[in-house]
């Protein structure tokens, strides 16, 4: 795939791949040294902390480099002569980002499993955690799309784009800690419309609570868990809206 080859030439792509190995490795070591040294806790960290704080902003930063690449190199006119529609250009770039997101999560899962074997931790729920790793890669890709849409809308303002990425990531991350946001029924509220709080409400039901505090929170929170079909449906609708907006913005951009 041409777009994948373009990504491979980017230094940020290599850096992102390194983080896909390093961050889960460090996180796994911290979990193992803590009180919750089980395979489920390791994967929870990789899916949530690594995904929410690292993967999502990386996807947007990769998008910044990817979507501005043709404009920076003045190759957009040549691409359109071939001909390749702007819609197909956008879709191909987003597919590459989706593949990267899934691979990022699978790499984290693999490192968690390898470290568990090294420290003789039982691989309980291996199949489920592998499926969740793939699913998390998909939903975090969807979570990044609203921010990518904003980045495209602001055109080639790299500094502003980075600021948007920082604010978007931090806002979503903080929100998923707020009980006032995540403990709400499905509806037109932040706990439903903001991607990370929604994803957290879906993911947490697969956690295995340890200790009285976690068990008490799990029981209170369980009333607001979001099923897999509902979570994916909401994110699918948001993704379609974002992609249509991207295509509209990209088509109006001067070459």
What are these regions (language model features)?
Residues 1-17:
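Aromatic- and glycine-rich beta-strand/loop motifs that create alpha-glucan
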Residues 249-255:
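Short cytosolic juxtamembrane segments of multi-pass membrane proteins
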Residues 34-42, 162, 166, 170-249:
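Terminal transmembrane helical anchor/hairpin motif
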Residues 16-20, 93-94, 165-166, 235:
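Residue-level recognition of transmembrane alpha-helices
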Residues 21-64, 92-158, 224-228, 232:
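Secretory targeting signals
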Residues 1, 67-80, 147-184:
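Cytoplasmic juxtamembrane interface segments
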Residues 66-98:
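Helix-loop-helix units of permease transmembrane domains in multi-pass membrane transporters
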């Amino acid at each position: 795939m041409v777009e994948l080859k373009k990504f491979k030439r980017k230094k940020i792509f290599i850096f992102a791949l390194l983080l896909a190995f390093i961050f889960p490795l460090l996180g796994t070591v911290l979990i193992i040294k803590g009180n919750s040294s089980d395979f489920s806790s390791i994967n929870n960290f990789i899916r949530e902390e690594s995904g929410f704080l690292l993967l999502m902003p990386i996807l947007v930063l990769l998008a910044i480099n990817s979507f501005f690449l043709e404009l920076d190199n003045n190759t957009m006119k040549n691409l359109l002569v071939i001909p390749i529609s702007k819609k197909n250009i956008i879709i191909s770039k987003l597919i590459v980002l989706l593949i990267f997101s899934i691979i990022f999560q699978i790499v984290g899962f693999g490192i968690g499993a390898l470290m568990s074997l090294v420290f003789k931790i039982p691989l309980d729920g291996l199949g489920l955690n592998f499926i969740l790793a793939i699913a998390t890669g998909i939903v975090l890709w969807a979570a990044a799309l609203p921010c990518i849409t904003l980045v495209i809308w602001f055109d080639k303002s790299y500094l502003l784009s980075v600021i948007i990425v920082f604010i978007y990531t931090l806002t979503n991350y903080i929100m998923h800690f707020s009980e006032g946001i995540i403990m709400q029924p499905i509806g037109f509220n932040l706990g439903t419309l903001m991607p990370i709080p929604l994803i957290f409400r879906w993911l947490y039901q697969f956690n295995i609570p340890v200790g009285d505090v976690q068990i008490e929170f799990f029981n209170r929170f369980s009333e607001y868990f979001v099923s897999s079909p509902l979570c994916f449906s909401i994110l699918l609708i948001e993704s379609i809206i974002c992609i249509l907006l991207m295509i509209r913005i990209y088509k109006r951009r001067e070459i």
